[in-house]
Amino acid sequence: MTPRPHVTVKWAQTLDGRAAAADGSSQWITGADARGDVHRRRAEADAILVGTGTLLADDPALTARAETGGLLVPADEQPVPVVVGHRDIPENAQIGEHPALAPHGLSAPLQYSGDDLVAMLADLHSLGYQRLFVAGGPSVASALLAARVVDEVLIYLAPSLLGGPRTALGDIGIASMSEIAHLKIVHTAQLGADLLIKAAIDPAAPTRSTLTSHPIQEGTSCSQD
């Protein structure tokens, strides 16, 4: 097996599985308690990843922040920002000023095309990143799940309904029930009105060769930053 970081994928969704309204708006699906939990978990990661679709749509800061708005952990302990996708990072993007860049000797966020996710993760591992937190969006989460390179998911479930086409996940490479991905729920928590479900993915699950490289289809979505 190719060495890679431990990969945690996070998303927020409504009860009917939507990550955004039909017009693309998504702030906020979950409440303050759930968002605070996300930031505490970000602080435990070495790197934080977002797709260019979400980057361009939301301009997320990708920092681990306290309720007051300040940094939850010092700059040198903040997760290093990683961007995946072919589109350029805008010059005025917030992550260009990410506090973790200078302490880690970086002048800009790390960026990968997303054409080979296994190779991307191997490179991150070689750079010393052991824990990767995936902040969004649905295209990135779906591609990583399809490539079978995710260790656990954090699903923040809001007691609300949106309907429409903007689902939390897209195609994850499963065509029939015989290929269903079984997860093990390892933790649940009530966070205000919302529910956190933490589930681990069975490392023994079969990996289809057609899924070892699953390019990301770039779209627009929310990181719930």
Please name every model-derived segment.
Residues 2-133, 139-142:
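Active-site ligand-binding patch in enzyme domains
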Residues 117-118, 172-225:
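Conserved histidine-centered catalytic loops in small-molecule metabolism enzymes
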Residues 124-133, 142-150, 159-164, 196-199, ...:
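Generic C-terminus detector
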Residues 137, 156-159, 191:
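Short, loop-centered acidic/histidine patches that primarily coordinate divalent metals
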